[in-house]
Amino acid sequence: MGVKKEKGRKRFRKRKTFGNQILPLELLIEKNKREIINSAELMEEIYMKIDEKHTQCVTK
């Protein structure tokens, strides 16, 4: 008869962690459309960011 091999300690596979990923602006806007539309302050912030990006692209 064969001898049973001793099983070692099971090791858990680490889940892949993706740090704090920054979602692209467009995706954020898609996810939070209702909140943004209802909030004038958020709308202003987004327009400011879009303007900043646009001016950066134009100057490059």
UniProtKB/Swiss-Prot annotation:
To B.subtilis SenS. It comes from Bacillus subtilis subsp. natto. Pfam families: Fur_reg_FbpB (PF13040). Coiled coil: none annotated. Keywords: DNA-binding, Transcription, Transcription regulation. The lineage of its organism: Bacteria, Bacillati, Bacillota, Bacilli, Bacillales. Regulates the expression of extracellular-protein genes of Bacillus natto. Residues 11-31 bind DNA. GO terms for molecular function: DNA binding. This is Transcriptional regulatory protein SenN.
